[in-house]
C-alpha cells in the first residue's frame, strides 16, 4: 500500500527539480518571442513525396556551387526537420553538396498517423521507405545519409535494405539495438527527469507557452552534463514557429516513434553485412543513448570509422561541429561518385 504514495513523492520531487532546469527568464523570453518577428526557418524549396498514401514533407537546400551529390539528413524521435541547425549543414552546402531534410511521418508537415494503434503501428523499415520515397520524388538515384538518434537507426536500415540507394552512412548518437539488455541503459535520474518534464508540460500541451517549455526542457535534458551552452531563445523560436507557421506538435508521435524503435528490434546481425562506407559518431557524455551502444555496433559494421567526442551529450552543439564536419566530409569525399 505504501508503493503509490512513495511513487507520488518521488515524482513530485522531480517535478520540483525540473522546474528549475528552465532558465529563470523563460517566461520573459517567451513573451519577447511572441512580440518579435520570427526568423524564417524554412529557407529551401519544399514539396511532398507520397509513400503508400502517406505524404512526407521535404525541403531541398541547394548549394550555390553544386557538385552533383546530395546529403540526406534524418532527424530523431519526435523531431521535425527544423531540428537541424544551420551551422551543421552550411559547411556541406559550401562544399557543393545539396541537402535534403524532411519531416518523419507523424510530425511537422508530413502526415500525422491518426489511426495509429499499438496493433496497427509502423516500424523503422516503414520510416526508411519514407526516405526512399523522397529520393524517388526528386529523381535522385543515390545519396549520402546522415542520421541522428532514431534517424541513425533509420539510416542503418536504409544501408541494410536499400544498399544501392546509399553512398555513405553516418550514424550519429544512435544504436544498433536500443533495447540491448547487455548494455548500460539510461540512468534512473535521467529517466525520472523525462517523466517529470512530461508530467509538467506534455500532459497539458494546451497553451503555446507549455509547448515551448516542453521543447526547451527536452533539449536541456538531452544536453546532459556537456560543457557548453545551448541557445534557449533559438529553441523557443523554433518551437513557436512550429506552432504558428506549421502544424504544431503531435502529442502522440513520441509513443509512435518509440514503438517503431522497439518493434524493429536488433540490427546487429544485419549490420555485419553492410557494405556501405560507414561512420559512427557519438558523444561520450550522451545521457540518452550511452556511448557503449556506439562502441558495440560500430565494431559490427565492416570497416566503420568512429568519432567519439568527449563532452558531447545527445545533441549537436556548435563547438563540436568542425570535428564532426571534417570526419563526415572525409568519408563522403572518399566515396564520391564524382
PLM segments and residue spans:
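Conserved HGGG/HGGXW glycine-rich cap/lid loop of the alpha/beta-hydrolase fold
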Residues: 54-112
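Acidic catalytic loop of the alpha/beta-hydrolase fold
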Residues: 285-289
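Flexible "cap/lid" loop of the alpha/beta hydrolase fold
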Residues: 169-205
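Active-site loop/oxyanion-hole signature of alpha/beta-hydrolase fold enzymes
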Residues: 107-146
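Alpha/beta-hydrolase
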Residues: 192, 196-197, 205-269
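Short beta-strand/loop motif that positions the catalytic acidic residue
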Residues: 274, 280-282
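Conserved hydrolase catalytic core segment
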Residues: 141-183
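Catalytic active-site module of serine/aspartate enzymes centered on a nucleophile-bearing elbow/loop
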Residues: 304-338
